């Protein structure tokens, strides 16, 4: 089946998107003295008017929590390296966006804190959303290394193609049943667009092969995986599997034919950057109800989507793929946790973080359904602030949706999550530190 995308934006709305209601740790503090500034490190595109948005957020946080927020956005291409340098040095960091596999490495390096007691004391909104077990699911031997963002819990590998080119070359998406069916499509489009990359790939793990995999890598696919994760707990050599051989062979053939960029092995650009520049036809990506909104709003193009499966799989990375951790460098982890938990329960702060300031960066077009759009004269190219990565922030389910979004997006996201098939290893993360490699004698 094919999905046609005709929407902008990436987050949704609850019925109280315009409010700033929050509970538990969000109650007004009686603390006195100078407010503590919580430094939150994100990844994405630099925002011209970031300071203006910080001021608006701090107008909320200071009277509520005696705290302020300093947003640090690291560029996609160098974020991992920059964050590692920040954590290794004396630079002040309080909260950081990461994933379970990387967070475990930070944990063993002593660069992040155990969040268990912080959740107990300040994680009221977190526990209301997830319950205590899921709020603490990202842990090893009781050390909680991060808390999950409110996002889709499963995904379906799919092909995303620019809709204008699908229509221009009369591509029949009903004939696309599995990845190998894309070869004829690439051949057709490349003949008319010889300077365009047919399929995205980069050197930082964002490859067609990784996007197509339905294996559960248990936090580190390089050391083994569950190839039939919903039915078996047998760990297999991922690289020796029939699926890997067949898929890698297909992709190598496509590379030789020029469908994949010749610099894929050294490319560090994010796919959004390449697509926005008009140089990309398609990519394999995980489909869920929110991707149609995110793709067009972040690239300016509508996409035709063809999922390769009917149901999502919820596996070991579903609650650890995107998390927030508290850095060891934090000078006040209690205040950092208070601010983080507040954001999980505050539509007002979530909207500021993701969309900017109402009336300047966006206007509300449909209050009942929480739909917003750019003000007159403002576009994606000249907006002062439009972070537009709601999935990277704590709780996108309580924020506004962009014009063209399904009014029931978050209800459908919840239904999508509920429809998922669970991996036999759900909740497990492999701890690579347990493996000791001996030098040969």
Located regions from the model:
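Extracytoplasmic/secretory soluble proteins
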Residues: 2-438
